[in-house]
């Protein structure tokens, strides 16, 4: 049974963005080496060898080494690579802000998400109600 990248891919990226977001602000040489090795070995752990090979080519084309000097640099590199992969899959690119907003959305408590959804629906119902009232008023006015 082949593992569908549409299932594991988003989780894999969530994990990689978590790794980038928790990278030391100013890493020492040992940490930079450990993260470099981690990134270089990632293709080995992708469930589909062809995808691993493509990812390997991508990190050869855009090496991580210059971006391991700080957390911000590493976050930007991870975002850049994610967008490059998205482009190769005909998926839309996202800004760093969109990516981070989507990332942190996963940490919202269910109660907060439910309350936001309820408010969104209430706004839609309110707008539809106003539109119906305006249409009715226009109809009655033209009578």
How would you describe each model-predicted region?
Residues 1-27:
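Short terminal alpha-helical segments
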Residues 6, 10-12, 61-93:
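Charge-dense polyanion-binding interfaces
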Residues 11, 15, 34-37, 50, ...:
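Acidic, Ser/Thr-rich intrinsically disordered and amphipathic helical segments
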Residues 27-30, 53, 92, 96:
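Short, flexible/disordered secondary-structure transition segments
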Residues 31-64:
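Amphipathic alpha-helical packing elements
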Residues 92-116:
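Juxtamembrane amphipathic/hinge helix adjacent to a transmembrane helix
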Residues 116-143:
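C-terminal single-pass membrane-anchor helix
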């Amino acid at each position: 049974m082949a593992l569908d990248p549409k299932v594991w891919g988003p989780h894999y990226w969530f994990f990689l963005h978590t790794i980038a977001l928790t990278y030391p602000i100013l890493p020492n040489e040992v940490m930079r080496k450990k993260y470099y090795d981690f990134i270089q070995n990632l293709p080995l752990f992708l469930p589909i060898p062809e995808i691993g090979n493509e990812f390997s080519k991508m990190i050869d084309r855009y090496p991580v080494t210059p971006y391991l000097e700080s957390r911000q640099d590493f976050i930007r590199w991870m975002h850049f690579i994610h967008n490059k992969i998205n482009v190769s899959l005909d998926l839309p690119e996202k800004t760093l802000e969109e990516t981070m907003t989507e990332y942190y959305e996963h940490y919202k408590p269910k109660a907060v998400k439910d309350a936001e959804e309820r408010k969104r629906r209430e706004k839609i119902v309110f707008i539809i109600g106003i539109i119906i009232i305006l249409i009715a008023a226009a109809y009655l006015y033209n009578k």
